[in-house]
Amino acid sequence: MNASVKHPHTIKDEFELIQSATDYYLQRDEKWWISGRFFQHELISIFQPVFSISQGQTMGRAAYIRAKADGEIVLWPWQIFSLASKDEQLVELDRLCRAIHASNYYFNHPYPSDNLFVEVHPRLLESVKDDHGQAFENFLDLIGVRTSRVVIEIPVTVNRNWKLLRHVIANYRSRGYLIAANYSIGCSDWMIKLGSLYPNIVRITANDLIQQEDIPSLVDSIHNAGASLLVREIETSIQFATALKANADYLQGNLLGQPEQAITTRDLLHRV
């Protein structure tokens, strides 16, 4: 066993600490995986590897929420969040999901130095005026994880509101989080618009990358801004080859690794 893997008694102690210090409805199974409850649904984490081309292995994993019943997935993220019709319910659900993700990732991950990628709901960004990420930072402090180990994925819909996008990036960055923004196809000057608030990572789908007329110029503009390029939703060998040829930094997609409720190895990119 890797020396960085936490022993069951350590996880138990930390889980009890979380229960005593928060009002999250959490539970753990016999394998020490933590789940939560929202509107009678059991919420679980699944993780998809994000690969670093230069390292040839995972540099992190993207976390997604699912609702499970009788061992089967019954609700997908958009269905789960649709249950939160009120802003206060949305805030509660979002914080619960992040707590579940962070607990599972850092309690069960054999390589705790890898980054955790977490999504943020666009409605949450609009309903929380300031101090984005403060509640999550408090939870990370509780379990002993630095915010610099977490990548906040800003939803692509926020690109339509530049004022909000700049405000959100500044908020999260001030707390030490890494920021991943999505490239907007057809908006070539968006990096310039962000001014000095360049994200750490720019995400683009494999399909959108292939559709670019001048891929080298796009990639150069991202790298010149000091950001790394992550190509996601890689499903085919052609998309994979295009991402490699484009000089992308990070890769993610079902071709490389399916989302699953397990973190067992530091996957190697050359297995593809």
Protein language model regions, located:
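EAL-family c-di-GMP phosphodiesterase catalytic domain
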Residues: M1-D29, W33-R37, E42, T157, ...
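Active-site core of bacterial EAL-family cyclic-dinucleotide phosphodiesterase domains
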Residues: Q19-F81
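Structural preference for beta-strand elements that scaffold enzyme active sites
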Residues: I44, G60, N115-E119, T147-E153, ...
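Signature for phosphate-centric chemistry
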Residues: A69, V118, Y183, A243
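Extended, compositionally biased accessory segments flanking or bridging domains
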Residues: E72-L75, S85-V91
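Catalytic core of bacterial c-di-GMP phosphodiesterases, primarily the EAL and HD-GYP domains
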Residues: D94-W162
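Distinct, well-ordered alpha-helical segments
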Residues: E126-D141, N161-V168, C187-I201, A243
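Short beta-strand/loop segments at the ligand-binding rim of alpha/beta enzyme cores
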Residues: V168-N182, L218-V231
